[in-house]
Curated annotation (Swiss-Prot):
This is Probable quinone oxidoreductase. GO terms for biological process: cellular response to oxidative stress. It comes from Saccharomyces cerevisiae (strain ATCC 204508 / S288c). The gene is ZTA1. The keyword Oxidoreductase applies. Its EC number is 1.6.5.5.
């Protein structure tokens, strides 16, 4: 398979901190690769909340910075030292700078070779699910090892990660208490496995949690909201409960005294996916789990909407409005 690789490509980048107006769709150099790297022509890339953290300055990055964290596409060039991939292989992978027509990644991963003949819809599904499914898998295995009978509080239960967590928690036999802002979102969360529902816009979350757990509190809280729900998560946990904080959708959690964890022996963790897949064996384990669950259709990845790459500014506004349900995907121009 021969492919003419251009010198310039279309990307989504930021070169300053700010609002949606700093998001730019521009020409940018196609990256050059080393002897151990792959050059991938992207077809689809997933939209994640983390992009907003770079744009707002919550996470530092060198400017200009091409956004994006996951994609699927085709290998169009490889370094001389690469032996495990061939030009023409279809792949799904996790890397920086995937809001682009071309991205590079080490041949050692995290990248997975897809079966020959993978369809366009499957490419979209893998790009939509890779980061969030692996996040949910690793968090429920390692950040807090969910056990049968556990009561788990889940915020943003109808978001991309939330819907995956609902399904995995049900598979593990946990009782999921889903929190969302509308009855429509809660209905979807229930369809995906939630057992108890709390409408955050009109119900007292803590009161409902204590009601559902007979006053005991939850074994774990999976909280991607951040500032607005931090105190609720702390209060809702039972003795020896685990607080899994993995997002800042409402803003950064203000500084607090660590002694506040002592009265109930609470464990607070702030995990990130990359810490669980850094080793090749870890990557293989979780990517195999991903394929098994998705290809067997045991796990349903709900795609909210697919946008052209140039319309990422609209997608960013949609996901940050916290009104979307499921995953947002960008289609890359070919």
């Amino acid at each position: 398979m021969k492919c003419t690789i251009p010198e310039q490509q279309k990307v989504i980048l930021i070169d300053e901190i700010g609002g949606y107006d700093v998001i730019k769709y521009e020409d940018y150099p196609v990256p050059s690769i080393s002897e151990e790297e792959l050059l991938i022509k992207n077809k689809y890339t997933g939209v994640n909340y983390i992009e907003s953290y770079f744009r707002k300055g919550i996470y530092p990055c060198e400017k200009p910075y091409v956004l994006g964290r996951e994609a699927s596409g085709t290998v169009v060039a490889k370094g001389k030292g690469v032996t495990n991939f061939e030009v023409g292989d279809q792949v799904a992978y996790i890397s920086n700078s995937t809001f682009a027509q071309y991205s590079k990644i080490s041949s050692q991963g995290p990248v997975m070779k897809l079966p020959k003949g993978t369809s366009d819809e499957e490419l979209k599904l893998y790009a939509a699910g890779l980061l969030q499914v692996l996040t949910a898998l690793s968090f429920t295995n390692e950040a807090y090892h969910v056990k049968k009978g556990d009561y788990v509080l889940l915020f943003a239960a109808a978001g991309g990660v939330g819907l995956i967590l609902n399904q995995l928690l049900k598979m593990k036999g946990a009782h999921t208490i889903a929190v969302a802002s509308t009855d429509e979102k809660l209905k979807i969360a229930k369809e995906y496995g939630a057992e108890y529902l709390i409408n955050a816009s009109k119900e007292d979350i803590l009161r409902q949690v204590l009601k559902f757990t007979n006053g005991k509190g939850v074994d774990a809280s999976f909280d991607s909201v951040g500032k607005d729900t931090f105190e609720i998560s702390l209060a809702a946990l039972k003795r020896k409960g685990v607080f899994v904080s993995f997002g800042n959708a409402s803003g950064l959690i203000p500084p607090f005294s660590i002694t506040r964890l002592s009265p109930k022996n609470i464990t607070l963790v702030r995990p990130q996916l990359y810490g669980y897949i850094a080793d090749p064996e870890e990557w293989k384990y979780y990517s195999d789990e991903f394929f098994g669950l998705v290809n067997s259709k045991k796990l349903n990845i709900k795609i909210y909407k697919t946008y052209p790459l140039r319309d990422y500014r609209t997608a960013a506004a949609d996901i940050e409005s916290r009104k979307t349900v499921g995953k947002l995907v960008l289609e890359i121009p070919q």
